[in-house]
C-alpha cells in the first residue's frame, strides 16, 4: 500500500488493490452557521466540488471515501445544506463510486445517499486499511491495522523572523501504543 497526499484537496490517495481517495471534514454549509453569528461568507461548496473533481480526475480512484463531517449543521441539515448537498453528491457520484463514514456533524445525512454508500460510523475496513471519522472509539475489528481518521483538523503554523506566518493543513502519523487511547501496536494482528 502507498499513501499519496494531495495538497490540492487536501486529500489522501490510498493505493492498494483498490485506489481509495479519502477526504474528511468538508463541513459543507458552514457559511450559513457563520452567517447566523454575524460572519458573512458566500458558499464555497462549488469550489470544494471543483477541487475534489480535480483530485478525482488526476488520481482516477476506484472509490471516493468521505471520512465524516460532510455537512456542518447539527442536528438537522440547514437550508443551505438541503439545497447544495444533493447536487454536490450527484456530481461526485457521476465521476466515481462513493461512500461515507458518518462523522459527528452528519446527523440525518442518510437522506443524501443511496443504499450501500452509507458506511458504519464505527469504521470500515477496505483492503486491510481501517477508516474512521475519529469522533468515537474505532470498532475492535480495526485493531492492529493502519487507521486513517479525520475529525481533528490538524494544522501547521510556520512563523518567520519578521513575524509573517503561514498556516496549512497537516497530516499526522503515529504508531498506537499503550500510552495512546486506542489499540496497542502489536495487538490484533
Residue locations for each model-derived region?
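Conserved catalytic scaffold of divalent metal-dependent phosphoesterases
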Residues: 16, 23, 28-29, 54-59, ...
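N-terminal active-site segment of His-dependent metallophosphoesterases
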Residues: 1-83
Amino acid at each position: 500500500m502507498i499513501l499519496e497526499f494531495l495538497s490540492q484537496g487536501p486529500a489522501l490517495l490510498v493505493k492498494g488493490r483498490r485506489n481509495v481517495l479519502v477526504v474528511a471534514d468538508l463541513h459543507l454549509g458552514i457559511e450559513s452557521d457563520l452567517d447566523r453569528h454575524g460572519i458573512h461568507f458566500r458558499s464555497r461548496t462549488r469550489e470544494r466540488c471543483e477541487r475534489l473533481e480535480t483530485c478525482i480526475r488526476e488520481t482516477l480512484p476506484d472509490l471516493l471515501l468521505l471520512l465524516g463531517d460532510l455537512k456542518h449543521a447539527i442536528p438537522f441539515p440547514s437550508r443551505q445544506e438541503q439545497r447544495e448537498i444533493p447536487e454536490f453528491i450527484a456530481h461526485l457520484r457521476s465521476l466515481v463510486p462513493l461512500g461515507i463514514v458518518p462523522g459527528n456533524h452528519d446527523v440525518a445525512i442518510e437522506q443524501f445517499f443511496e443504499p450501500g454508500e452509507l458506511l458504519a460510523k464505527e469504521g470500515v475496513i477496505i483492503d486491510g486499511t481501517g477508516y474512521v471519522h475519529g469522533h468515537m472509539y474505532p470498532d475492535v475489528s480495526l485493531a492492529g491495522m493502519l487507521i486513517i481518521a479525520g475529525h481533528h483538523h490538524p494544522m501547521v503554523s510556520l512563523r518567520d523572523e519578521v513575524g509573517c506566518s503561514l498556516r496549512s493543513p497537516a497530516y499526522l502519523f503515529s504508531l498506537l501504543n499503550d500510552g495512546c487511547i486506542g489499540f496497542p501496536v502489536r495487538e490484533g494482528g
